[in-house]
Amino acid sequence: MRLPEISIWKVILLLHLFALQEFQLVSAANLPSLSSSTKAADSSSKGSSSAKTTTSLGKSSVTSKDVSSSHNVTSSTKMPKITTSASTSLYTNSSLWSNNSVISTSSITPSSVYIPVTDGNKFLYQAHHPNGTVFIAFAGCLGAILLSLTGAWIALNIKSWRSARKENKLRNLENQYQHDPFYFQTNINDDESETSSHSDDSDISEKVLKNNSSRMSLYTLGSTSVLNLLNNKTDANDNFRSSMFISPTEILQSDANNSNTWSQSNESAIYDSLSSTPREPGATQILGKFTDSTNPFNYTSYNLSPDSEDRSTPKSNVSQGKVKKYRPPSVHLDQLLDGKE
C-alpha cells in the first residue's frame, strides 16, 4: 500500500490553521493577550515595537493596544497590570503594588565565612596533648612486650649455656676417673680430647660411650688391671665374689673351651708390674683355680645337696674317673646334667 505524498507547504498551512483556532478560543474566553518587548541595555538605541491585533467573533471584540519596551502588559479587560523590574544592586529589595497584586524580587550577595582566632579565647578548649597520642601509646605497649620477650629469651639461653657447661665438666670427670686406662689401653689426655670434640652435646649418654672401643664388663672390678691400679694384691676368688652376677650356663659353656688356659698362664705374671697391661681373665680362668674344697658352688661339702644321703652318684662318678671340678648352684640343673651324663 502506497502512502499519499504530502508536501511541506501543506503541513505548514495546517499548523497555522491550528494556531489561529487556538487564538480564537482564547479571545472568546475574554482572556487578556500578552505582548512583550525587550529593550537593549545601551541607552543610545531606543527602538520600540508595537503590535496591534484585531479579531472579531460574533458580537465580541478584543483589542490589544500598544505595548512599550518597558515590560508593561496591558489589556482592555479589567485584569491587573503587572510590572516587574530587576535591579543590579546586591543588597536591594524591590516590591511593587498594582491592583492588589504584589511581586517582589530579592538578591543575596555571597560572603566569606569568618573563623575566630582561638588564641586567648576562654570559651574554646585548648588541647595541650601532642598529636598522635593513641599511636604513641600503642607503640609503647608493643615495644614493652617485645623487649620483655627478648629479655626472657636471653636469660633462657644463658641458663642453658651454663647447664651445658656444667654437664660437660661432669662428663670429662666421668671419662677421666670411671674408665680403666690400663684395660682400655688409652691415656687420660686422649679421653679428654675425645670428649672435648663432643662438647656441643648436652647429655652424658650415648655419643661418648659409643665411641669407646670397649666398655667395662661385669668382671672389670675383679680384673687384674684394677688390682694393678690400686696396688692391692687380693685373691681372685674374692674378686670374683665381689660381683653379684652369677650365670651357671655361661660358666659351663666357657669351661669346656678354656679349661687349660689358667694352668698354662703364670699366676705371678699378673702382679709383676704396674706398667704392664695384662688381659682380663675370664670367669672360667678364675673358677678353674678353685678346688672342690674351696669351690663356693660345691654344695656337697656343706651337705646341702638332697642326694647327700645317697652316696651312689658321687661314688659312681669317682669310680668312673669323671670327677667334677665344681657343682652348679642349682640342684635341679645338677640333676638334669647328671641325668644326661
UniProtKB/Swiss-Prot annotation:
Signal peptide: none
Region ranges (Disordered): 35-78, 272-291, 298-341
A Gene Ontology cellular-component term: fungal-type vacuole
Biased composition regions of type Low complexity, renumbered to the chain: 35-70
InterPro entries xref list: PRM
Job description of the protein: Appears to be a structural component of the chitin synthase 3 complex.
PANTHER family: CHITIN SYNTHASE 3 COMPLEX PROTEIN CSI2-RELATED
Protein name (database record): Chitin synthase 3 complex protein CSI2
This protein's encoding gene: CSI2
